[in-house]
Amino acid sequence: MGMAAEVRMVLYEDDSVQVHYACGSTLQLSPCGSEFLFEKALPPSTHPLEQPERIRQRTHFVISNYREQLQRALDFRNSSATCPFLSESIIPPERKKHIFIDFSEVEWPSLDRDDCIMYSESGVVKITSLDGHAYLCLPRSQHEFTVHFLCKVSQRPDSSGILSETQNQDPKNKLVEKTRKVCRCGNLSEQTLRNKENEPPYQILKSKNASVNTCCVNDSEGRGELPSLGTNHRCVYAWVKQAWSVAACPEAWKHPLSLALRFYNKVRAASEIDADFPASSIVTSDCPEERGTEVSVLPRALLLSCPAPHMHRWTFCDSLLQRQPDAEDFSYPELVKVVWYKGVTYRLTHKNVNSIEIFPGDGSVFKSEGAHFGNYFTYYPSQEESEKREEKTYSVNNLPPDRPGNFFSVRSLIKQATRILQHCAKIRLSLSHNYRVCCWKMAPGVSVSTILPVLLKESLIPGVGRFLAYSDDKVHAVFLDGVTVTLNWHLSSSAEKKQVDQGLSFGWCRLTFPDGQDQLIPTEHPGAYERYVTSVISWCRGLTQTSPRQVPTHLSPALKENWSVASELEKIQKFNWLLENSGVLNLTSSKNEQCSGHCKSGSSETLLEATNEERVSVALKRTSEILQDIDRLLSLSRK
């Protein structure tokens, strides 16, 4: 089946993907990658109320009609995902590799060595691991880098290879145990699988003092023998390509990236001194003796089946809006990580603030700059044009007009980036609190309540409104006129002077009006809403200036559990008391006495004090008298 080309591909923070095609069709990929939903475009003559055809399938069992589209969507996901999803059934044969060993980490040269380091005439530095299972490429611009590594394909939950066991071992035993890890994928009964619960799918960078050849089998007691390496014992690996920003490098690639940056500086310094320095070469170490190496644990592929498929969320577009591809760019309530739109890549980072980088495709890059990220963009030309063109800074409020013959439109690129930043600002200022819950992050035995934020501080200011602060640095204020303000503010402690005005550094706050409409307002220039923003910021500054003992940063799980149970029981007791004493239900006297006795025996003292029985009884008595008067008037009017 022929399919139109992709127009927009969006990767969200939970690693879910949305793909929009030129024909109007859409493809959604679950965060774990194990399931997808394809929504076909409706013809122009279709009735507006007719729903489009939707196909929902498991990724591992995709039919041939959607195989190519799903493969490109998975490649886009795996290029920037925390954990790749690699289904053996849809990976091309040229990207597969059968290996007789099971490995989950690679060794890199140390900082004082230049082994396995290459650079080309174009200025690209290539760092290759000692075992050849991964390599990193850093271009001369040094804004982003790509990494290629071998990753074991996704396995079924009941059959997986031997996992890394180096976490519970001594450093001396790690090197010996690493040489014993021979893959036996065909017979799991001969293995001893040990995997810690709640272990993250990837580990941080580790260091070792010596390199070990993982292709051999070693046993200090002389009892180790190579097993029969037949076809059933081979592990299937696939090459994965990822692209990351140098400013937001994952832990696993920090050492090879630092090695590439250090080596590039050496090459540039040598070329300035010696004009005859070769433009491309392979540089080896001057000292042949063995030296220390660095070990990175590779990202581990997710399972073929999702552990929590009930958490998959699908967005269904309106049939009228679906005919307008640019009507709604981001309908998924999640932070955006990467956007590919008509050949241009937008890469975002979400640490303390939302920052974005734009890669038009010609080697140049735009970066959001300024006190409020997103108000200014700095243009860095490509390396070939760096001698002719200088760096420029553009303001969002004063963009230059488009010039004929340019490779791209600066105005359209920055406007698109601004829309992405505004979407992320709305998500960060949302009170849904569910964007951190993800299906592949839900380990067995982990409660969702431990992930959701907790109320840290609540204040009721007379004549102003109610202010609340949560553990996820989110502040919510409800004013007496019905206007609500939400912003982010760092509440960890007053010792961090640099982040006292974290809400201001974010640059935006969200106002919700009584009619339900909301609007993003810059905190530095709120305009007509200055009194709302100023009141919230003043209250936040008062919180950061208090002692850490007065503002708790977190609650223990036991305290949170007791607090939630007590509050729910109190609500149930109040509801039961009001129901039994309001006379709404015509219960028998015996049942009323039994229920009232049960309530009194439970918590009569605290309950009567909380609800104030006398006021409730007086109000009910007056209500009954009014109803009797109404009945009398109705009876008299009928006569």
UniProtKB/Swiss-Prot annotation:
User: Mind giving the lineage of the organism this protein is from?
Assistant: Eukaryota, Metazoa, Chordata, Craniata, Vertebrata
Say which domain of life the source belongs to. Answer: Eukaryota
| Protein name, as recorded | Uncharacterized protein C5orf34 homolog
